[in-house]
Curated annotation (Swiss-Prot):
Signal peptide: none annotated. It is an enzyme of class 3 (hydrolase). PANTHER family: EXODEOXYRIBONUCLEASE 7 SMALL SUBUNIT. GO terms for cellular component: cytosol; exodeoxyribonuclease VII complex. GO terms for biological process: DNA catabolic process. HAMAP family: Exonuc_7_S. InterPro entries: Exonuc_VII_S (IPR003761), Exonuc_VII_ssu_sf (IPR037004). It comes from Allorhizobium ampelinum (strain ATCC BAA-846 / DSM 112012 / S4) (Agrobacterium vitis (strain S4)). Heterooligomer composed of large and small subunits. Belongs to the XseB family. This is Exodeoxyribonuclease 7 small subunit.
Amino acid sequence: MTDVAATDIAAYSFEKAVAELESIVARLERGDVALDESISIYERGELLKKHCEALLSAAENRIEKIRLDRAGKPVGAEPLDKD
């Protein structure tokens, strides 16, 4: 894959990247794609997968757990534990 393709993917939203990745998987599963094209779209799929993983990781890092006092009222937030 070219750097242009990676740059193109970097601008994708999570939803757009997942939709294209699903399309690639469907094409590869059908088996009606020439070998060279299969390799090319597989490589693009790998880039899309990595992009989705990075977006999910960034979102996970932004999520906070709300702390409650004894009465159950919110008193602040802290980073979500990674289990």
